[in-house]
């Protein structure tokens, strides 16, 4: 998934502090709006609890206060990826081959921006998703948002 320049810079800045606390930085989203939001997703083998999120928030806030890469007011949110886990990297897609995913594309493919199907394969920066029995190939750089579809 293509990250903005700001998201790339933020990822570089906060990866080390997150990993130093023993967590994986799953990904980040910076959502611009009336009240902008920096959303950070973390995970660990043992799962994530509220105290973990608070610890990461405290550490990341300290880094962001010093570096000050965001020029607008924003809210910082730290959370686990949840059941509808967002996918950010080729490694994430490869880890969840065989799982159902929803995709929102930056540019339409076959006049569609929204797709839902099962991740079949990952090849470099391309993913194959089986949609209604047919394989569709998408460039990771064209994926604006991707989430696993939880099944109960």
From Swiss-Prot:
Pfam families: DUF150_C, RimP_N. Keywords: Cytoplasm, Ribosome biogenesis. Its main location: cytoplasm. CDD domains: YlxS_C. GO terms for biological process: ribosomal small subunit assembly; translation. It is found in: Cytoplasm. One of its GO terms (cellular component) is cytosol. It comes from the Bacteria. HAMAP family: RimP. Belongs to the RimP family. Required for maturation of 30S ribosomal subunits. PANTHER family: RIBOSOME MATURATION FACTOR RIMP. This is Ribosome maturation factor RimP.
């Amino acid at each position: 998934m293509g990250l903005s320049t700001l998201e790339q810079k933020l990822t570089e800045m906060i990866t080390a502090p997150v990993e130093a606390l023993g967590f994986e930085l799953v990904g980040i989203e910076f959502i611009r709006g009336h009240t902008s939001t920096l959303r950070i997703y973390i995970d660990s083998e043992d799962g994530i609890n509220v105290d973990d999120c608070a610890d990461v928030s405290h550490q990341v806030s300290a880094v962001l206060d010093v570096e000050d890469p965001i020029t607008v007011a924003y809210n910082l949110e730290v959370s686990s990826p949840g059941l509808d886990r967002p996918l950010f990297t080729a490694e994430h897609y490869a880890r969840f081959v065989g799982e159902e995913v929803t995709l929102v594309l930056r540019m339409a493919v076959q006049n569609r921006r929204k797709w839902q199907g099962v991740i079949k394969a990952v090849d470099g920066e391309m993913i194959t998703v089986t949609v209604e029995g047919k394989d569709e190939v998408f460039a990771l750089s064209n994926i604006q948002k991707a989430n696993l579809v939880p099944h109960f």
